[in-house]
Amino acid sequence: TVDPDGVKAYVTLQENNALAIVDIASATLVDVVGLGFKDHSLAGNYMDSSDRDPNGAPVANIISRPVFGMYQPDSIASFTVDGQTYLITANEGDARTWGPFNEESRVSSLDLDNTVFPTEAALKNNASLGRLNVTNKLGDTEIDGDFDALYAFGARSFSIWNTSGVQVYDSGDDIEQTVLAQDPTHFNYSHDDNSTLESRSDNKGPEPEAATVAKIGSKTYA
């Protein structure tokens, strides 16, 4: 997206969880800003992390999980309020895969640090975090072969940032909570014909992909 005066462009670097700021006139890169992580253990940031809960049955279960979400936005748009430009992102998430390289693993396949995750066996159950896809390239902070933190793809939300890449708002778990309340039959549903309830819960959930902004009268809508 481009700011209103046409000076700078803002480009999402989705798989790298970052934002590039480009000077248009000189066609040069001004900055690359990391977007950070979302703590799904905090109230308001909860998630449904399994397509088989409880006991293998598909039931919506939006709760606190010891997982960080990588925002990894796909679409980005900009808008102005009181002379200040803001960016809005749809935090879809996407894994890096090419050739034999694949950073995607289910939590059940990873060795977790027992100090950080004392209930490892329970967490790796399919009804808990076992089915959740996370990156296998981030989280071994002690570099000892086990994972001290878990990072899932996408943040299941939309965010608003200032033009320096500082987050000023995130929708938290509103998308999952709203879909569950308004259309529970299609909660975390896939778009294919054979989808089932919460079939996407283990893989980016509602997966927001597009962001569009429009002004109607004096109000701005996204």
Each PLM stretch: what is its role?
Residues 1-222:
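Beta-sheet-rich non-transmembrane sensory/scaffold domains
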